[in-house]
Amino acid sequence: MHRVYCADILLKSESPMNDFASMFEKATGHKRPHDYQSRLACGERQDKPEAEWFCGGTDCASRLISVPTGMGKTAAVTLAWLWNRVALGNGKWPRRLVYCLPMRTLVEQTRDEIQGWLQKLAEAYPDNEDLQRLAAHSPIILMGGVENDDLRREWDVYPEKPAILIGTQDMLLSRALNRGYGMSRARWPMHFALLNNDCLWVMDEVQLMGAGVGTAAQLEAFRNEFKTFPSCLSGLPSTTWYLSATANLDRLKTREWRNKERHATFIFELSADEKKTAVVCAKKTLDLRPNKKMEDCVGEIIQRHDALAAGKPLCSSLVICNTVKRAVALYNAIVNELTDKENKPQVLLLHSRFRRYERREQRNNLGKPIPPAGRIIVATQVIEAGVDISNAILWTEVA
């Protein structure tokens, strides 16, 4: 039996959401999105009243999104897609959101965030059929060693339904190249078709991806040249969003793009006013300790943390070491120093050599509420790329 489907260019939403700001608040709990998040979902404000701006949508076009770390890029792209495709029912936006990441840790973190947003939105808008399906059947995880449950495993049997896929670059890009890792050869063409048609590709943390960035850019160019679905009907180009706090346009100038100009709004960044806000211009006190090893600072690390925790409970300190060996040694030294202390902070160790169940346990510990005495996290550079952790004090080795 052949399953045939067709995309309407304009869809009808059964339960229209009031406005983007309202949807954003219900999903994330934040009362108001950043202006750049609203621009990504609703387009440029220009002279529109705010209420009218929040009720509108925008076109879906490829972008290089350059926004500082910690300003909610994951929420921005996910909710922009949900707003335009699901809330407004705009069939010109792709049916599937494909979220590609360079590290397993980031896949797990992104999965938890998006899953939480979908559940909250499904509760807030129970009459929206697409949203209810997304909450039950998405996100689908494509990552080595991960099995999806029964509701998510057969996502490729329903190409007419909206879906959110999250995975590592090896699993996603190999499928887009018709050489899917970890799957039967007989199913390669199916995933090849589904991931090259009707998809908004999001390449997050591209500075960590290596050859994956060029591969994604080449695939974007090929999809434009051969007119994949729905661009073959609508005339709109294939869409890929490249996300990074340290964006580099030169990395996207692959062979197929060398003699082509990107559209005028391809580079998407904070406006001049947004760059002056407190969240971007926050003052940071820097203190350099030359000729001093991290192991010699154990007492000071604990002392500084305790002093801060006394005036600001539930705070966290982060210590970054250059090697796993140093991180383990420093962790043991801090734990030994705190042995006889009564009201002591929680101490966690994070590095890349943990086994899977240990990583899961550490991730769960990070997600738990901070104890009254605070938390000290000792980590390697595994913590630096996109991991969502807020800390009051940062100690780091510079050499």
Q: Residues of each region from the PLM?
A:
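N-terminal helicase ATP-binding lobe
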Residues: 1-399
